[in-house]
């Protein structure tokens, strides 16, 4: 079954899809932390697909990824609501770096679980933004499973990449 034919997946998709108002609100929150990123014509891509094609240069953000947008929209909502005083997440890189950046900006403690073989460059980026790192599991799924089972993380709110409407609304501001 695809998302279009599976009623459960379709319902989840519709629940996460931001409204125009949520996207505008997210854009306002994010604008305090991220400069606009340019779109550039990609001549090679144009040649290959036969039409004008532009790419968005999200790699110039401090996180070097569009994922900063979602994290920067989620974290202040959690902080203001008092929903969590400590966060945790599992990542192989970009999501962890984005959450680390946002949590640093909002002074919210974060623990990022990464697989033991995680890329050193990504690990350094996560660490540079001040998150506590835990090397757990051999892959992302195993890392998540360990974190969700380990009582050491029971006092944290676990953030799954892409599973929050605030994350999706933040990401929708890329346009």
Describe each PLM feature range.
Residues 2-175:
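PLP-dependent amino-acid enzyme catalytic core
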């Amino acid at each position: 079954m695809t998302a279009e034919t599976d009623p459960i997946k379709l319902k989840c998709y519709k629940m996460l899809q931001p409204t125009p108002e949520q996207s505008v609100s997210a854009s306002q929150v994010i604008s305090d932390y991220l400069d606009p990123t340019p779109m550039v014509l990609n001549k090679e891509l144009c040649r290959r697909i036969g039409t004008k094609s532009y790419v968005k240069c999200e790699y110039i953000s401090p996180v070097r990824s569009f994922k900063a947008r979602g994290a920067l929209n989620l974290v202040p909502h959690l902080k203001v609501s008092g929903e969590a005083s400590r966060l945790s997440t599992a990542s192989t890189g970009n999501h962890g770096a984005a959450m680390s950046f946002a949590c640093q900006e909002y002074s919210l403690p974060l623990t990022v679980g990464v697989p033991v073989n995680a890329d050193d460059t990504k690990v350094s980026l996560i660490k540079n933004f001040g998150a506590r790192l835990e090397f757990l599991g051999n892959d992302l799924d195993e890392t998540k499973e360990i974190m969700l089972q380990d009582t050491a993380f029971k006092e944290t709110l676990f953030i799954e990449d892409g599973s929050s409407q605030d994350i999706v609304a933040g990401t929708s501001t890329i346009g």
